[in-house]
Amino acid sequence: MSPIVFLHIPKTAGQGIHAALETLVGDPGRVSPVRVHTQCRAGSQMPPGYDLYSGHIDWTELDTLPPDRFAFTVLRDPRERIASFYFFLLKESRALSPEALARPENTGKRAVLELSADDYFFAGTPGWQTFVRDHYDNFYTAYLATRRMRGRQRLGGLSEAERLDRARQGAAALQGIYEVDRLQRLEQDLSARFGRPVTLAGRVVNAGEHVRGERRWPKLLARFESDASAARLAEFTSLDDVLMADLLSSDGS
């Protein structure tokens, strides 16, 4: 079969989509083992020979796959994605022991637990600020423009218009851009490709401690001590708002 590539942006209901894709592919041996970009810092994130590539991965190697591939991603209201990511890390951090929290790989989880929202997003060392901005600051724009999970710094020196233009060019290399609240189109496209019904609605994994449909963004803003900090956080969606509206409009959503 032609390869399926699911570029899973964190906190966009991707775990349920990945599980559905695994079921469709059938053979676990046909699923690429690379699920996170940090697994292969120097190696291939899209090793040849698999039917499914799915995860928080860079996609600089997309053009090495057969031209009849089906590559897609799913977007979510960028404010809700930011808030959901924050609360997910907070939940994860609370489940860790002090010893586990002290490990270097859990620096982000330790920070979200110990710091105020103001300090988590806008204080700390330059290295910490790079981490925060790479994961939260107009992530869709950076990911589509650079094809990298942590590609934001590669856009340094570009104007907002240039960043958006590069992101649109990147998106044009994909066969589908979908919205998390409207997965019917993805269901239809996958059903047509596999020749059998595909159901994605309701396959929510890692929903966290929130009522289904509850908005996370207001809850995150309420954690800020400074209105100025809350306003700065809103700027983390300024480009993504424009990009998402453009892409979903042009994609027929």
Segments from the language model and where they lie:
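Short, well-ordered loop/turn elements at secondary-structure boundaries
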Residues: 1, 47-48, 66-69, 171-173, ...
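PAPS-dependent sulfotransferase catalytic core
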Residues: 1-59, 84-85, 90-101, 199-250
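Conserved aromatic-histidine-acidic binding/catalytic patches
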Residues: 5-9, 70, 174-182, 228-235
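A residue-level signal for conserved active-site and pocket-lining positions in enzyme catalytic cores
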Residues: 13, 77, 178, 190, ...
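Non-transmembrane alpha-helical segments in soluble domains
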Residues: 18, 22, 187-191, 241-244, ...
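PAPS-dependent sulfotransferase catalytic domain
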Residues: 40, 55-62, 67-73, 80-200
